[in-house]
Amino acid sequence: MVHSNFDPDFDQLPTSIPIFPLPNALLLPGGQLPLNVFEPRYLAMVTYALASQTRLIGMVQPSGDSNVSDTGDDPLLFETGCAGRISFFQESDDGRFVIALNGVCRFNRIRQQLEPKGFLIADVDWKPFAHDLRIDLSSLDREPLIEVMKRYFKLKGFETDWAQIENSDNHQLLATLSMICPFAAVEKQALLEADSMAKRADLLMVMMEMALHKESGGNDARH
């Protein structure tokens, strides 16, 4: 994968980062996630991250039915998340922050605490995912993936620039596809935790095929 010159090296990753628990929001290393931030505690979180050297925010999905929007209580979260560097920041006239996160590296949460301003800070372990910061030169059989992708996009009514898809590198293709497809939270988490590009591609194909199979009522005949 390609990293920005602004991304930290592995030994520059901090021992703790602010956590943004957002349902069904998946960030992968090399992906980009736009966010519209308006709750006071998360405005404070973004301000905290901007003041840090690495400008990192950890994206973690809630693992249960806890509503992270209605209460400051500690929500139930998946253990593994992905840290994104704030690469774009803009203030709006109505008091929102519009930001974009560039995925840098996955992490496991060790422990966390609630800050006085209402957002979470977690001590994190980066070591299991040190390879996220290396360039992945793995090969990928793209044709079966793109064939399933075309049928899945047609099913969902998605429009895309197929020329751009064809020109994207393997890592970018998998990151973008994993992030934009409307999978369930547990499926998105499986994609996040996949330990290789090949396994993530296999998972994506299985998930899209299952959606196609379900829509067809179990009839897999193609026309």
Label each region the model flagged.
Residues 165-183:
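Core structural elements
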Residues 191-192:
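C-terminal helical "lid" subdomain and adjoining coupling/linker elements of P-loop NTPases
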Residues 1-163, 186, 197-200, 206-223:
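Positively charged
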